[in-house]
């Protein structure tokens, strides 16, 4: 906590290994609190957390709101359909309304890439002591999902002592619609920062050839990468090649709502070539976990049988881990605000 320096959490590109360690350790402390009584902590009593979701969400929004309530914060929820957006109000107008109401942290999800960052810059220019936490923006970033996936994997590899160090040297495959996935981008930052080597796998239409260079550029506004020994990123078009000797698999939803009709015409062919099943996991050569950020298209990204196999599928773990991870982020951003 003493070394935490982030006023906003917009993506994970500027996170140091110490930042990841801080978040994982704090989330683990929140997760291990005895599940008895009210299960609430007074840590953020008197703080106001507002969830401003300009784009639909079930898991992320519910998780953030439950996380805030478990820290005893007041929660205000924003729904575009019941707002003044239909009257011409801009996202900044909406944000400033909640700032005027005394909000300490604004969790913002928006379909436009870069909108949370623009809002954060506007608040800083106005010298407002209010934090923006990106709940997912366009194709850019979904930092809390990247962190909860990291936390879930650290638990799998060492349940007694979850730590980013647990994934150093591991080979992790990310399979599916990487082109349209803000989750993939956040996972690339977090996993490689902690020393994992990532292989990206998908058809050319969903995985550009130059995507492996994504983590090579310095983070926005910085001269150099804060990570000294970042893991490597490679691309494979062959699922068997990608899964061979892999230690964990993250499969991604086909975001059909973001695709043109001819981008991926045959879903059966996609499942046959890139779908994760019990049979395809044999290529890993060992027992490996499978993660998915949800919602899952059954029989496309992964088989229904695998989805329901809790000895392999960590999807339920991801959902439950989302709460302590988001508790940690809300605490780090708002605990020191007056």
Curated annotation (Swiss-Prot):
Keyword entries, A-Z: Pyrimidine biosynthesis, Transferase
Gene Ontology cellular component annotations, sorted alphabetically: cytosol
Ligand binding (L-aspartate): 87, 182, 253
Signal peptide start-end: none
Enzyme type, top EC level: transferase
Function: Catalyzes the condensation of carbamoyl phosphate and aspartate to form carbamoyl aspartate and inorganic phosphate, the committed step in the de novo pyrimidine nucleotide biosynthesis pathway.
Subunit structure as annotated in this protein's UniProt entry: Heterododecamer (2C3:3R2) of six catalytic PyrB chains organized as two trimers (C3), and six regulatory PyrI chains organized as three dimers (R2).
Name of protein: Aspartate carbamoyltransferase catalytic subunit
Organism: Prochlorococcus marinus (strain SARG / CCMP1375 / SS120)
């Amino acid at each position: 906590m003493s070394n935490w320096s982030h006023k906003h959490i917009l993506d994970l590109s500027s996170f140091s290994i110490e930042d990841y360690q801080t978040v994982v350790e704090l989330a683990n402390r929140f997760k291990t609190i005895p599940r008895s009584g009210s299960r609430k902590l007074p840590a953020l009593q008197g703080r106001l957390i507002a969830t401003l979701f300009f784009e639909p969400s079930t898991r992320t929004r519910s998780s953030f709101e439950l996380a805030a309530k478990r820290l005893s914060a007041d929660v205000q929820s924003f729904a575009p359909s019941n707002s003044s957006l239909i009257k011409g109000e801009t996202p900044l107008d909406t944000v400033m309304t909640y700032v005027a109401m005394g909000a300490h942290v604004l969790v913002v999800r928006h379909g436009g890439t870069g909108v949370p960052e623009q809002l954060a810059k506007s608040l800083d220019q106005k010298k407002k002591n209010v934090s923006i936490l990106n709940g997912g923006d366009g194709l850019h970033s979904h930092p809390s999902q990247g962190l909860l996936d990291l936390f879930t994997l650290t638990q799998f590899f060492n349940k007694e002592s979850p730590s980013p160090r647990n994934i150093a040297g591991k080979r992790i495959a990310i399979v599916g619609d990487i082109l349209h996935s803000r989750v993939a981008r956040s996972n690339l930052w977090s996993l490689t920062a902690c020393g994992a080597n990532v292989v990206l796998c998908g058809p050319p239409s969903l995985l550009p050839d130059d995507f492996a260079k994504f983590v090579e550029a310095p983070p926005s506004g910085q001269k150099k990468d804060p990570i000294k020994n970042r893991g490597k990123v490679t691309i494979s078009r062959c699922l068997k090649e990608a899964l061979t000797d892999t230690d964990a698999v993250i499969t991604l939803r086909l975001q059909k709502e973001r695709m043109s009709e001819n981008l991926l015409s045959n879903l059966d062919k996609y499942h046959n070539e890139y779908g994760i099943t019990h049979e395809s996991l044999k290529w890993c050569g060992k027992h490996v976990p499978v993660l998915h950020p949800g919602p899952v298209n059954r029989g496309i990204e992964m088989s229904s049988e695998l989805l329901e196999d809790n000895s392999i599928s960590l999807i339920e773990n991801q959902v439950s881990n989302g709460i302590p991870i988001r508790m940690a982020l809300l605490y780090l951003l708002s605990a020191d605000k007056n």
